[in-house]
Amino acid sequence: MIEKEEIGIAIENYDECISGSKTFVFNTKGGTIGSGDDCTFRIQDKLEQIKNTHAIVSYEEGSFTIAAFEDSDIYYNKSFSRMPSGYEIIISIGDIFKIGNLEFRFVDAKSIEASIKENKKYLE
C-alpha cells in the first residue's frame, strides 16, 4: 500500500518516446495514460503502438491501481502475459509496466518533484 496521495511514473527508456514528458505525477483523481489529447499523461512510442486511451490509473481505499483500457496491451512487472482488460492491479513503488515499446516505473512523487526543482536550478 502506498502511504502518499500521489504517485509518480517515469519512462525508463525515454529514447523510444516521440511525444510527451519523461515523468508524470498522479494524484487521488487518477487519470489516463495514452496518446490521445484528452489523456492525463499523454505519450507515444516510436512505433506508434500506444492507443488514444491505453491505461487507467485510479485511487481507491488508500491505494493506487492501474488497469488496461478496453483491449489495450499492458505487461506488468516483466510478465510475458498481458494484463486482462478491466483487471485492476494495486501499484507499489518500483513496479514496472510496459505499454507499446515504452517501459515505465512507478516512483515516489517527491523524487520527481525534487528532480524538477534541481533541473530548474541548473537552468537558472
Where are these regions (language model features)?
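Intrinsically disordered, low-complexity acidic Ser/Thr-rich regulatory segments
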Residues: 1-46, 96-97, 101, 110-124
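Forkhead-associated
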Residues: 25-100
